[in-house]
Amino acid sequence: MGKNVVVLGTQWGDEGKGKIVDLLTEQAKYVVRYQGGHNAGHTLVINGDKTVLHLIPSGILRDNVKCIIGNGVVVAPDALLKEINMLKERGVPVEERLLISEACPLILPFHCALDIAREKARGNKAIGTTGRGIGPAYEDKVSRRGLRIGDLFNAELFATKLAEVMKYHNFMLTEYYKVEAVDYQKTLDDALAIADYLKSMCTDVTELLDTARKAGEPIMFEGAQGTLLDIDHGTYPFVTSSNTTAGGVATGSGFGPRHLDYVLGIMKAYTTRVGAGPFPTELSCEIGDYIGHKGQEFGATTGRKRRPGWLDAVAMRRAVQINSVSGFCLTKLDVLDGLEEVKICVGYQYPDGTVETVTPLAAEGYEEVTPVYETMPGWSDITFGATSIEQLPAAAIAYIKRIEELLETPIDIISTGPDRNETMILVNPFN
């Protein structure tokens, strides 16, 4: 029987999930996105050719894989169409490989307008959203006024529902935020123009996945963002609007949680964060600049500069607990090449001198803590492109072993570069 594997980020996103998903899809029949929207950015490099995906699952470049967008994903029709056309121009037969749940909430222009207006109104207290309407679309879903892809298939009813929700949101835009209203007729026409095309790719995702499971076909679930951005378990309120953790698989795809076999946590050899929010191990110094420059730490979605820092084992322990991580994939080890020493945060010290090895439950709690570091020797040898443990310097191996000890979880895959072949698979999640 085929295994069902979850691949998700265990930090604040940008861990290198896209490459690993693409690599492992060689053994999967289905790749499923179950949360988030086009605020995610997954970068694939195949034979030096770079592809950045935001909404479509990373398995789309494989001809043996069906890609699924589950009900937990918020879909902006214009962004989806743009991504499809980009792939089709490169010869990828997207319509043959992509299936979508008609229960996906729609992101419409007024969601983006609200997102931007809110961030502007917050001033220096801005959360750091991508401005793509993700949060407002999830709000509409939870408040039960949101429109879904399936609503597009009844034009008359969709027009009525759209008028109701736009009346509400345009009032907020004009009266509270003092910005222009979004045009109803244009929003309606643009949405209905893509309705038939979307309908051709829609399916009952729950039924499809359960049928695949019973047939023994391996399924991969691709997470977006990272554990520390989870709406419930992340550094709230500096989080995304969906469940980025393993629990989101069941709610965002309709696949029963008892049928998941392995959870692969993706973790950088250091830490980055993009946008606002607490970050205890942040390096606002020359070493941070070195890591950020060498690691090319710029967001795939927004191009924003990421904030670099040392690996935070305290936060990673929380990620292991929340996701029941089976094993880790350690990425960007090569970025640490050349440093005289490397550090791992092993505790948080509070003003009264106490040291804790668990994370605070609210963002404000992070303001009090000072990271307690364990310092290890760095290495001058190059790890970039290494394909076996034997090729790694002793200090790098010691660093890996120490991470495993601190997290009580094995590192099953090591990535030493952006290309598919620059990877060591020590334990294959699908075996």
Swiss-Prot record:
Which keywords does this Swiss-Prot/TrEMBL entry list?
Cytoplasm, GTP-binding, Ligase, Magnesium, Metal-binding, Nucleotide-binding, Purine biosynthesis
Q: What does this protein do?
A: Plays an important role in the de novo pathway of purine nucleotide biosynthesis. Catalyzes the first committed step in the biosynthesis of AMP from IMP.
Q: How does it assemble?
A: Homodimer.
Give its localization. Answer: Cytoplasm
Q: Where along the chain is GTP bound?
A: 13-19, 41-43, 306, 332-334, 415-417
- Tell me the cofactors it needs: Mg(2+)
Q: What is its EC number?
A: 6.3.4.4
- Pathway involvement of the protein, from the record: Purine metabolism; AMP biosynthesis via de novo pathway; AMP from IMP: step 1/2
Cross-referenced Pfam families: Adenylsucc_synt
CDD domains linked to this entry? AdSS
Q: Where does IMP bind?
A: D14, E15, G16, K17, N39, A40, G41, H42, T130, R144, Q225, T240, R304
Q: Where does substrate bind?
A: A300, T301, T302, G303, R304, K305, R306
- GO terms assigned for molecular function: adenylosuccinate synthase activity; GTP binding; magnesium ion binding
Name the InterPro entries for this protein.
Answer: Adenylosuccin_syn_GTP-bd (IPR018220), Adenylosuccin_syn_Lys_AS (IPR033128), Adenylosuccinate_synth_dom1 (IPR042109), Adenylosuccinate_synth_dom2 (IPR042110), Adenylosuccinate_synth_dom3 (IPR042111), Adenylosuccinate_synthetase (IPR001114), P-loop_NTPase (IPR027417)
Q: Which domain of life is it from?
A: Bacteria
Q: What is this protein called?
A: Adenylosuccinate synthetase
Report the catalytic activity.
IMP + L-aspartate + GTP = N(6)-(1,2-dicarboxyethyl)-AMP + GDP + phosphate + 2 H(+)
The residues that hold Mg(2+) are D14, G41
For this record, an example GO cellular component is: cytoplasm
Question: What's a GO biological-process term for it?
Answer: 'de novo' AMP biosynthetic process
Please classify the protein's predominant subcellular localization into one broad category: cytoplasm
Give the cofactor note text. Binds 1 Mg(2+) ion per subunit.
